[in-house]
């Protein structure tokens, strides 16, 4: 593997000194870029794009050709794991992801097998190794998975949900069934993420997109507990250096202290959290990633630059901050505004790293 030329993202996650605050964007390879739309059209549909390792590599690299980003993130989807379990993932226009065979009974859960990441998910591993090779050491490659709770919401509900009624019913009426599902998912994610590291991922992120839908006690029981299990099972060293792990629970600002106790290296923050407050609460234990509202990228460029400055000042001096959005970039954002955002982070953050 080529020597890493820009490692400030990895260094910041480990709270080592950096020259400027590193920056990348969730969903940086996505529909706001015209070149992404062209490649997706070439693939035919979203999952065909994910399953073609050469095209997945191409869209991963596209934002790095445009912008001075400090990390690349594997182009894939969190639902690859349940798809590999045989649920029959498909996408309906305007409806989002759906499953032909939801896992909404204990009998269905018992029948689930843990997928082999080098077999059923081999296309993801081929994408990881291809991207790592093509990056040629330019920036680190982030691998990722959904959290067990978040994956389970889609599996039990049969797709996206606004109320999570079915899975919450299972949580409170049949908790043993849900724990069985979450346990299988945690085991699957451990294998999946470790295989990503073996194929070249240099950092890992666990996306708990729907943890914020849970009550205080239910979050610990049904979400955090299983992310803890994953972290305990991960490969934490590769290529002679630590593989940092970031946990991101959208809507999880209440639980930062508990999340920081898991042994992760960093916490992702959504835009509802004050980053200065987050640093006071957990900055002695973990690095922080975030956390500009993605909708701010619709603002005039001077307003974007102002908000970048506000968040940098909120975090303050020293390392341990990776700048990002508080969630994925929206599809209708002007690519020039995204570029201005990235430039502003690098330009304005120098003063905080002396």
Swiss-Prot record:
SUPFAM superfamilies, A to Z: UROD/MetE-like (SSF51726)
Q: Does the keyword Phosphoprotein apply?
A: no
Q: Which InterPro entries match?
A: UROD/MetE-like_sf (IPR038071), Uroporphyrinogen_deCO2ase_HemE (IPR006361), Uroporphyrinogen_deCOase (IPR000257)
Using the UniProt record, give the first listed, main subcellular location: cytoplasm
GO molecular function annotation: uroporphyrinogen decarboxylase activity
| Catalytic reactions on record | uroporphyrinogen III + 4 H(+) = coproporphyrinogen III + 4 CO2
Binding sites annotated in the UniProt record for substrate: 27-31, 77, 154, 209, 327
Q: Where in the cell is it found?
A: Cytoplasm
Give, as in the UniProt entry, the pathway in which the protein acts: Porphyrin-containing compound metabolism; protoporphyrin-IX biosynthesis; coproporphyrinogen-III from 5-aminolevulinate: step 4/4
Read off the Pfam families from this record. Answer: URO-D (PF01208)
Q: Say yes or no: keyword NAD present.
A: no
Q: Which PROSITE patterns match?
A: UROD_1 (PS00906), UROD_2 (PS00907)
UniProt keyword terms in alphabetical order: Cytoplasm, Decarboxylase, Lyase, Porphyrin biosynthesis
Entry's Gene Ontology BP terms: protoporphyrinogen IX biosynthetic process from glutamate
Give the first-level EC class, as a single word: lyase
Q: What does this protein do?
A: Catalyzes the decarboxylation of four acetate groups of uroporphyrinogen-III to yield coproporphyrinogen-III.
Family stated for the protein in its record: Belongs to the uroporphyrinogen decarboxylase family.
Subunit:
Homodimer.
Q: State the PANTHER family in the record.
A: METHYLTETRAHYDROFOLATE:HOMOCYSTEINE METHYLTRANSFERASE RELATED, UROPORPHYRINOGEN DECARBOXYLASE
What protein name does the entry list?
Uroporphyrinogen decarboxylase
